[in-house]
Amino acid sequence: METPVIIPIHDPLITPLHSARDAVVGSDVQSMDLTPEQQEPVSEDWLDELALGLSEHGWMSLDMRARLGANLLAALKQEVQILDRTDAMKKAGIGRGSDLVRDRSVRRDKIAWLQGITAPQAALFEFFESIRQGLNQRLFLGLKRFETHYATYHAGDFYKQHLDSFKGRASRVVSLVLYLNEDWQAADGGELQVFNRDNDNEVCGTVLPESGRIAVFMSEEVPHEVLPANRTRYSLACWFRLDEVPLPL
């Protein structure tokens, strides 16, 4: 069996790790019941469907409420809400390390990296690990690990069209976004707009950021943007990567 390598990258220029840890450890979210009574396992058929969608179209959107379970989704939302009330969430930038640039004309969300240190995060990491192994078995992508962060978009926040990884960088290969917003309506804005990978002027899909829905796409190929939100919008982004060793702190 393949040995999992799960090493989230942390960038001290983006978020103070101890602040994020201290904000959620010991909070009420730790006592939430995560028993997966109604949770469906990640099946081979589901992984087949995901791999087929990525190989044929470069992206797909799926409803994961049944597979992740209401308890886990609620716990993750509570965590990001706690972080949003502290200084643990920082304005997101473009680039990494010394190349990090914060340009509010392009991107206005706030983020906090996950470390897998709480029960909800550990449960989520198991789900991501199943995807990593499943995609490797089906698409031979050679994914070594993943990194993930919470994101908060307040009213008026957006993220203009972009790619998650530049061609030839071979770092981020597959992107996944999980949404944590109940009762989200079209009038609330904040949709993920996905563009044709062969024509970035052509919209090929729009994803409403409702709780339990995920969007998965090839990081180097699929342009996308977050439209302006009209109320606070919570999500979680994950990238499956080729490199084994995280960037130095």
Predicted regions located by residue number:
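Fe(II)/2-oxoglutarate oxygenase catalytic core
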Residues: 1-175, 179-214, 220-249
